[in-house]
Amino acid sequence: EDNQLSQLDITQITKLERLYCNVNQLSELDVSNNTEIQNLNCDSNQLQHLDVSKNIKLEYLKCNDNQLSELNINNNRELVELECGSNKLRKLNISGSLNLSSLLCETNELDSIDVSKNIELSSLNCRDNQLLNLDVSKNIKLQDLECAGNELSNLELNKNVELTFLSCSGNELKELDLSQNI
């Protein structure tokens, strides 16, 4: 963590459970042999690709501030927290991550995100994307919602009675009913 590493070979450390290699200069990271890994922080590198498909025990993934244009987490069913902000993501499929409670995907190029199956979600930060719609009606445990800087024209929050933080400035909203969020 916080070095100037441009290479990191961990392929032989098969029992590795946690890896913090954030704030380096890594352009690639091979974690395919690290099938025991539960916590991976590779924030603030130069990664253009990250394959976590074999890391099925992964619970915490932080890959903010890289150059990722795609992130496939279809096999990561144990994921509880995902932070993938400040990348170049255009799509993000989180429908298989049913345990997800925190999602930070801000400052990407997302024009849609489906959180309808992520009913455990309590924190969602999707600000500064290109979202046209955001349906959080199934996310009744949602407490923190940051969706500022998108292109939302409608935001229904009447089922999100647990909401304690909301930031939705810089959208196309004409009205916002918060009467159920008292």
Show the residue positions of the predicted features.
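Canonical leucine-rich repeat
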Residues: 8, 29, 50, 71, ...
